[in-house]
């Protein structure tokens, strides 16, 4: 039987055909070729020896690069992108014996794969380019030779981030740098992409310093905004090559919905089969038809499970095929991965389950079929994975198996959207202040930063530099240049994968299990949580928020945990408003407070217990969009559903969930990258309001892009609800897996009414008109909090008032009212020495503050304080320090740190105490904190005994 017939059999099999939501037959395509005039003779000979004719898009790429253009090429997988940019680079290498090129890949496996391609080109063209990879696995003994002799170096952003400050060792390479190649550039989005964009700007600055102005060559999967991405990533303008002229075989792309009959017949989907077991059934079916299949899954654990089940079942059915099944994922040894890759190419393996580790362009040859178990999060990933089948001209098969969530079910009901032109926008945000400051520090470490360079390379204003100087993070030298004044490398403190440098260590019996950010600790690793790592379950026993530790123990349990939280938002500043007909979408800066107050133990989907949490609120500043719903909508809904409670609130909540659920359709993000809040009444807007915000400190550009595509987002969301046949809401429409309110209240019909009301507002004329709002301060949330603190003070609740004041001062250290009130509380509590410290800080911030002036008179009068500064032994600074130092020497780091915290609360300029705290963090393995405390201590006194010892450790 031919492969075509075998593939067609699946579509008609009675076991599967009722769940097929759509079949898209993608026609075979013939190639289109183009000759290049004046092609280098060596390259002509090479192409003829390989019997290669250049496709038109390859020739177009070649010509654009040789004409000096920056080029981004966005043709599909297996269309010959690599050859398209390698040939002009080789041409330059032949012409200029000193020319160099830097290839940047997001993954080591890709670097190694492309290294072999370049080595073969070097041999076939008989030129000396000595291509080498330079990453964390490169032996130290080889690094010097690579820096001095290699003309093409392949690396990844993480390695480049760390070695840029050693650019003097690469001076010859940078002096002759002609090309920077960024492969798989669609990978650079969100936090990682924004960090890499700043990294590329640092790289450009160094190249310019050595006199080179390299061309950029980017390759990418198909995007809605390729030129915008390329420009954001590099700061350059680009020539786009997006016409695919390579041949391809016919492909059937099947959208497969295991929930199809359940939803059509309105049967509870809890009775539906396991998606993973359904995936394994289809995987087995194809292998038994001798169809070589690659099965993509959403997690490492699922990859292993499906391979294990398939091997077990195949042993029972056709034992000789069981050894031809394998799993492939990150975490395997390199030689294991190479063996599976080669086994796929040779046909040794008939079926392989994998994570997205095989999505990128690693060469595994041609396959007959691909199964995609669950939408992988982006259309780019989906088509990259589907492109693994049918690399030659034979017919192939791709099957997307839907999960029950909004995105997967939307595609099942809207195949035209799925197969239509690209909708996804890759987002890079260069306005995040935390990222700006982190990379400015790195740049100043690499080379003194001249006035004007911050704006030229990083689009950062002079105000940012002044703030860094005020904070003593930068110094100004005699030439007026900005310099990083410390011995450490700030790149070591800043991860490219996150915004915050704060890191928590998850420890199991003294061994490091993983690291995570504070927000992730609150969501996944709070006390009592079940943490899953590499398929094993761990119970969180304790969390130390001040020292950054999470202690867990490995236990086998039959439940998981789900945290609940209450969210509050305050509008800090409006930045713009966009009119869509009669609907106004606002965009601006928000302050978000998330209170994680309890968690539930869940056995599958059934709650088996609820437990309180005692965590301080998680507060952060971000950017988001919001819009209001008039009271008339509430009145109408209450008339429509007179006997139901919380109809309006349920509709707002459902609209928020549904919109967020489809954000990834239009902006390349994960739904967990964004948060939301809906409320019947918001103090800042005076109306019912829906907020949607970036879930990252400072914002990352997701909601800003969402404003531009809001009409498309709204229409998609309405389609989603209209095509979902459930009665009152389900995971396919308005339920959210991350809802902190336990998906309550929700009302599907009210949700539909609200969304359709918004659509009617938009249908009027003049939509899409954006107005910038210059520095409009809507509300200062600190002033509101101060009012709360003052009210608590008047009631005599000093402890609660101080908690609120501490929150204010964490955001604004110079909030004069908060400083003065803290001083007054301390004065009333007879802590007059510390009260004086806060009073002086308040007067420094605002000399006219009445309360601070009154306090100063009281605190400096002889009747209030004795002329000598007296403290009892417990509060005596020297005594406390000696006690902490003795405990440190005895190895009691925990007790020592507790005493130091008390001391530093009183005297935060004690350099020896700061350094001793840094040493405790160092010995605890929390190196970023150790470096942070060294910086604080060395700014005060570089020559202190403990400061010098800490410097020796952190250096």
Q: What annotation goes with each model-predicted range?
A:
Residues 821, 855, 916, 950-953:
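Canonical tetratricopeptide repeat
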Residues 783, 817, 850-851, 878, ...:
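Start-of-helix register in tetratricopeptide repeats
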Residues 395-398, 404-418, 439-451, 467, ...:
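Extended Lys/Arg-rich polyanion-binding regions
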Residues 794, 828-829, 858-862, 889-890, ...:
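Register position in tetratricopeptide repeats
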Residues 11-49, 59-60, 66-82, 87-157, ...:
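Helicase motor core with emphasis on the C-terminal RecA-like subdomain
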């Amino acid at each position: 039987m031919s492969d075509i017939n075998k593939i067609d059999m699946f579509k008609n099999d009675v076991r599967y055909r009722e769940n097929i939501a759509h079949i898209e037959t993608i026609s075979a395509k013939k190639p289109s070729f183009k000759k290049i005039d004046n092609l280098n003779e060596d390259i002509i000979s090479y192409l003829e020896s390989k019997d290669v004719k250049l496709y038109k898009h390859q020739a177009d790429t070649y010509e654009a690069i040789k004409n000096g253009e920056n080029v981004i090429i966005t043709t599909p997988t297996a269309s010959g992108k690599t050859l398209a940019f390698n040939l002009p680079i080789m041409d330059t290498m032949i012409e200029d014996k000193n020319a160099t090129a830097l290839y940047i890949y997001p993954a080591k496996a890709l670097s190694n794969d492309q290294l072999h391609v370049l080595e073969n080109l070097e041999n076939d063209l008989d030129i000396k380019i000595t291509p080498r990879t330079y990453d964390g696995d490169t032996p130290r003994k080889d690094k010097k030779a690579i820096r001095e002799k290699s003309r093409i170096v392949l690396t990844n952003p993480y390695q480049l981030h760390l070695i840029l400050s050693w650019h003097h060792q690469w001076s010859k390479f940078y002096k002759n740098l002609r090309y920077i190649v960024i492969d798989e550039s669609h990978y650079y989005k969100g936090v990682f992409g924004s960090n890499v964009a700043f990294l590329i700007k640092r790289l450009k600055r160094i190249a310019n310093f050595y006199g080179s102005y390299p061309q950029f060559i980017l390759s990418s999967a198909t995007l809605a905004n390729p030129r915008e991405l390329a420009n954001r990533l590099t700061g350059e303008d680009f020539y786009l090559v997006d016409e695919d002229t390579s041949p391809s075989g016919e492909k059937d792309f099947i959208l497969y919905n295991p929930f199809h009959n359940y939803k059509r017949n309105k049967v509870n989907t809890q009775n539906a089969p396991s998606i993973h077991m359904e995936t394994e059934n289809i995987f087995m079916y194809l292998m038994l038809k001798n169809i070589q299949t690659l099965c993509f899954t959403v997690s490492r654990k699922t990859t292993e499970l499906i391979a294990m089940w398939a091997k077990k079942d195949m042993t029972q059915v056709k034992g000789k095929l069981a050894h031809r099944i394998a799993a492939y994922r990150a975490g395997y040894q390199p030689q294991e991965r190479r063996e599976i890759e080669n086994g796929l190419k040779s046909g040794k393996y008939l079926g392989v389950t994998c994570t997205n580790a095989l999505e990128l362009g690693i060469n595994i040859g041609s396959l007959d079929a691909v199964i995609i178990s669950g939408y992988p999060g982006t259309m780019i990933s989906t088509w990259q994975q589907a492109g693994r089948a049918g690399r030659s001209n034979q017919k192939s098969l791709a099957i997307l198996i839907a999960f029950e969530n909004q995105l997967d079910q939307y595609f099942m009901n809207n195949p035209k959207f799925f197969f239509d032109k690209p909708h996804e926008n890759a987002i890079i945000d260069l306005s995040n202040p935390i990222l700006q400051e982190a990379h400015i520090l790195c740049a100043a470490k690499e080379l003194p930063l001249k006035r004007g360079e911050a704006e030229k390379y990083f689009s950062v204003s002079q105000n940012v530099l002044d703030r860094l100087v005020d904070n003593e993070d930068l110094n100004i030298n005699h030439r007026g240049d900005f310099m990083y004044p410390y011995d450490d490398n700030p790149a070591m403190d800043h991860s490219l994968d996150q915004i915050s440098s704060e890191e928590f260590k998850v420890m199991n019996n003294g061994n490091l299990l993983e690291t995570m950010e504070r927000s992730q600790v609150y969501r996944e690793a709070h006390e009592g949580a079940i943490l899953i790592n590499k398929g094993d379950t761990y119970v969180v026993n304790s969390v130390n928020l001040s020292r950054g530790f999470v202690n867990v123990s490995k236990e086998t349990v039959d439940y998981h945990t789900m945290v609940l939280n209450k969210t509050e938002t305050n509008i800090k500043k409006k930045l713009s408003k966009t009119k869509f007909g009669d609907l106004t979408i606002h965009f601006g800066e928000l302050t978000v407070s998330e209170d994680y107050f309890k968690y539930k133990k869940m056995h599958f989907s059934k709650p088996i217990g609820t437990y309180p949490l005692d965590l301080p609120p998680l507060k952060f500043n971000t950017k988001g969009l919001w819009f209001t719903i008039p009271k008339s909508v509430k009145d109408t809904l209450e008339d429509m559903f007179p006997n139901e409670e919380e109809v309006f609130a349920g509709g707002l909540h459902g609209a928020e969930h549904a919109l967020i659920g489809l954000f990834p359709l239009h902006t390349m993000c994960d739904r967990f990258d964004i948060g939301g809040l809906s409320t019947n009444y918001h103090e800042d807007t005076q109306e019912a309001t829906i907020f949607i915000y970036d879930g990252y400190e400072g914002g990352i550009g997701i909601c800003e892009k969402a404003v531009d595509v809001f009409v498309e987002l709204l229409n998609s969301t309405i389609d989603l609800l209209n095509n979902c046949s459930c009665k009152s809401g389900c995971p396919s429409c308005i339920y959210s897996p991350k809802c902190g309110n336990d998906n309550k209240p929700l009302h599907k019909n009210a949700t539909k009414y609200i969304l359709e009301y918004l659509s009617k507002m938009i249908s009027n004329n003049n939509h899409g008109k954006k107005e910038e709002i210059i520095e409009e301060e809507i509300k200062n949330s600190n002033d509101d909090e101060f009012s709360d603190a003052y009210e608590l003070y008047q009631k005599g609740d000093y402890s609660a008032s101080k908690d609120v004041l501490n929150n204010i001062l964490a955001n604004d250290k110079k909030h004069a009212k908060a400083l003065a009130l803290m001083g007054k509380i301390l004065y009333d509590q007879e802590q007059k020495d510390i009260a004086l410290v806060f009073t002086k800080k308040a007067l420094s911030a605002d000399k006219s503050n009445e309360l601070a002036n009154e306090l100063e008179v009281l605190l400096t009068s002889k009747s209030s304080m004795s002329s000598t500064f007296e403290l009892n032994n417990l509060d005596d600074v020297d005594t406390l320090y000696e006690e902490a130092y003795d405990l440190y020497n005895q190895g009691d780091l925990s007790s020592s740190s507790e005493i130091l915290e008390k001391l530093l609360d009183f005297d935060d300029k004690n350099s020896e105490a700061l350094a001793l705290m840094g040493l405790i963090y160092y010995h605890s393995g929390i190196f970023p904190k150790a470096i942070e405390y060294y910086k604080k201590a060395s700014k005060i006194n570089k020559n202190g005994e403990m400061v010098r010892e800490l410097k020796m450790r952190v250096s």
